[in-house]
């Protein structure tokens, strides 16, 4: 029997968090090996474990997969979370890219220089409220199902829930005008595997704090 997937990243959300979410939603147990120093990262590189000398990297089914989208696609396909046909997969990909844009826009605020933070925060709030959330509210209304694509859970439902929780952390009032998204958040959060991942003590990571930012900058040699 194959062992658990092993996730290589630092002990924070970053680009690995959506992978953690997807594995958890699929009911897959996984291990994590945290990068805590530049030496940890260099060892992975020198041992030939990182195809492009970067993380995230996931060991799964005898492979060492790099690149977030490739990892997500493999997990979604393996655990039947990638739609039933090409049209559904195209919608899943399109929606996922928009969700990724929103996730990165919010996530990068913590790294923003102080003199730019106010302007970028205002821009992020504007785009969240007037571009991204209305788009997904419209999808839920027009599709008329419990899920974004088709009539069963797919990876994009998990990605959307994740970013809705980030939006809630960022500014909970941004969700107020979107009743279908609020209902979606409650519905997907209640799924057994997701509910378990949302409980204290899971491998879900909290928002990055100043200490984690400093550790990440050190590990990745970011000035």
UniProtKB/Swiss-Prot annotation:
UniProt KW keywords: Acetylation, Isomerase, Lipid metabolism, Oxidoreductase, Peroxidase, Transferase
Keyword Ribosomal protein in record: no
UniProt keyword Isomerase present: yes
Induction of its expression: Induced in the liver by beta-naphthoflavone (BNF) and 2(3)-t-butyl-4-hydroxyanisole (BHA).
Superkingdom field: Eukaryota
Positions carrying N-acetylmethionine: 1
Protein name: Glutathione S-transferase A1
Organism, scientific name: Mus musculus (Mouse)
